[in-house]
Amino acid sequence: MTMYVIKRSGRKEKLDINKIRIAIKFACEGLNVDPLELEADAQIQFRDGITTKEIQQLLIKTAAEKVSAERPDWTYTAARLLLYDLYKDVAHLRGYSLRDDLGKYKPYNRKNFYSFVKEYVEKGIYGEYLLENYSEEDFNKLANYIKPERDLYFTYTGIKILYDRYLVRDEEGRVIELPQEMYMLIAMTLAVPEKPEERLKWAKKFYDVLSEHKVTVATPTLMNARRPFTQLSSCFVLTVDDDLFDIFDNVKKAGMISKFAGGLGVYLGKIRATGAPIRKFKGASSGVIPVVKLINDTMTYVDQLGMRKGSASITLDIWHKDILDFLEVKTNVGDERKKAHDIHPAVSIPDLFMKRLKNREDWTLIDPYWARQYITRKIYDGKYKEVKPLPGSHYYVGIKEDGTQDILEPKGLEDFYGEEFEKWYLELEENLPSYAKKKVNSFELWKRLLTVAFETGEPYIFFRDEANRKNPNKHTGMVYSSNLCHEIVQTMSPSKHEKPVLDPETGEITYKKEAGDLPVCNLGSVNLGKVHTEEEIKEVLPLLVRMLDNVIEMNFYAIPEAEYTNKRYRAIGIGVSNYHYCLVKNGIKWESEEHLKFADKLFELIAFYALKGSLELAKERGRYKLFDGSNWSKGILFGRSVEEIEENSRQNGNNLPWRELAEEIKKYGIRNAYLLALMPTGSTSLILGATPSIDPIFARFYKEENMSGILPQVPPEVDRFYWHYKTAYTIDHEWTIRAAAVRQKWIDQAQSLNLFVDPQNIDGPRLSRLYELAWELGLKTIYYLRSRSAMDIEECEACSV
């Protein structure tokens, strides 16, 4: 009996086993796998009318199930089979043949690249800026530059995630582009700000580093560069003032940011505590928790077209009078009315608390409302007859002896760090009335914080004094908190509002607002599996700096404060992926002094060439607007003197010309106020087939369940380096913290530092020691405490690079 298969076009043809074998041969060629094994184990149950799609899916499934730590090459076989399927689907949709005029297999249609993009620009799926900035001739040149063979770099997990989440689809949900077309269109988008005569040159350079998997850009950039709405930034950090208008203005901002898939960090430390007065009515304030719940509910409501809930980290100071309730917002005990299960709590901790903790001394919780009243009056004491809050306003008013008034900027305890903070804290502790403060034992508070962290993985930790001491732009203000993933450390401030003014004739209402600093994360990362020598770093880092600077120009801004801050600071965040693989590839054990030396040498190179790239960009395009007065302008790099850095470089053996670089920076400036931030690289590491960010591997082989299904995970070259890969829950994480401290010397922002602890082999003192060591060694942040399966904690998709 003759059997027929149904092709994608709907046409019937005779079953030809040889065609299946050709597909299997293509998928297995050059790999350490047996094509006959795949053919036999697929056990295809042929029947009349079976579709070619069904046959292909069965082969993909069979190959994916064979992936293991001992036989990792099956991941490339499964990837090729999925690519083969994708090529056929896209060719059928776009109406071209997979064979050229000579019958040679050609998965990419170079001839019609321009007409393809033009069609989907007209349909509103690609952005008009592509046609506005590139001619048909440009498209043809770039189409011919595409390298289809680079598709073979993908693992099965990588291409599956790319297929499910990143490749652009039409209005019916069908994938319309191929991976190398995606990379080229992203490169073209990021090259739009370049001079027209140089645009193709930069598009090719950007394409090369992206498609060779040397770098990757943030999830929003991968998703939205080439689309009409170019929301390319990952995270945003809001500062909420103690004012009802500002609270709800920030709730609105949170909703708008979440609508366009941005992640959020929110600082609530300025808000008065429970029981504080409102307009002189005693005990009227409900405190911080209702605001936390407002943001929580906004994140769940603005669910990004039903795809996923928004994400927000909310930070409160450990001296805030509401801190005890705040620590419980995600626990399963206590009053459910005070819970906010969908936000990520973070705690800001000053040095003074850690000092008192060592001696088990008391700690005073303070209401920021009363602290602000006390400090503001004290600062202006002697200059005015009376200083009092201006009703309905952020400001205070100073009344002079002659009755004239000045508008005054208030200052709270949160507006100081280091010695100034300690001075004011001690004074408040001594002088505030009992209703404005509450005494607790520092150790008991710390113990509760760690217990909650052990149970839930959170709160994140923000060491505020170190963050502000090392802020290269401290001349512009304070850093109160970090972003959702706790790698961004930038100057921030609340916006200031004036009362709305009504025109009674027209009914027009005018709102005036002075924009504060709202940090924006423009992120990208370097794949250390492919880029770790000085020559490689020297080539790639300046390119990545340039790409991210162009993100700022191409970005769509959902809120004006974000654009204002982004254009003033031009902050970027360069991170890394494949760190663990880089170590094992170089024969370096995680728990070793060699690891620390390697990290020191490597991250000095990254820091130097990132700064060098930003310097060269400043020569070409101009320095960032707030450069004058910054540490960079004074020759202070990463919080250290040039002499100290030169000595460090000599010890590393790098001997880089830091003094020459510092002098050039003083003369020309740099383009970007902030440069380095080691973010998580969850989904984008999976696309690259890399180990995530700076984390150790979770296991040598496991299956991860996510939006793309159950996917096999193996680190790079696990068959070759099996015993070199030590897994996260078997590592002594004092080494992790020590390595992070070495890296931090070369990072102007922070690191998304996860700590992994085995519940069976950890106790309270040991856990406390890890956190205390992080503070002692000068870390700025701690991200998750992973005491459960890594798959149980939801990673921030927006920040993921």
Swiss-Prot record:
Domain of life assignment: Bacteria
Enzyme nomenclature, EC number: 1.17.4.1
GO CC terms: ribonucleoside-diphosphate reductase complex
Residues with site note (Important for hydrogen atom transfer): C235, C521
InterPro entries named in the record: ATP-cone_dom, NrdE_NrdA_C, RNR_lg_C, RNR_lsu_N, RNR_R1-su_N, Rrm1
Binding site for dTTP: D242, D243, L244, R272, R279
Chain positions of site Interacts with thioredoxin/glutaredoxin: C796, C799
Catalytic activity: a 2'-deoxyribonucleoside 5'-diphosphate + [thioredoxin]-disulfide + H2O = a ribonucleoside 5'-diphosphate + [thioredoxin]-dithiol
GO BP field: deoxyribonucleotide biosynthetic process
UniProt GO molecular function: ATP binding; ribonucleoside-diphosphate reductase activity, thioredoxin disulfide as acceptor
Sites marked Important for electron transfer: Y783, Y784
Regulation: Under complex allosteric control mediated by deoxynucleoside triphosphates and ATP binding to separate specificity and activation sites on the alpha subunit. The type of nucleotide bound at the specificity site determines substrate preference. It seems probable that ATP makes the enzyme reduce CDP and UDP, dGTP favors ADP reduction and dTTP favors GDP reduction. Stimulated by ATP and inhibited by dATP binding to the activity site.
Active site (record annotation): N483 (proton acceptor), C485 (cysteine radical intermediate), E487 (proton acceptor)
Primary role: Provides the precursors necessary for DNA synthesis. Catalyzes the biosynthesis of deoxyribonucleotides from the corresponding ribonucleotides.
Quaternary structure (record): Tetramer of two alpha and two beta subunits.
Name assigned to this protein: Ribonucleoside-diphosphate reductase subunit alpha
Protein source organism: Aquifex aeolicus (strain VF5)
Gene: nrdA
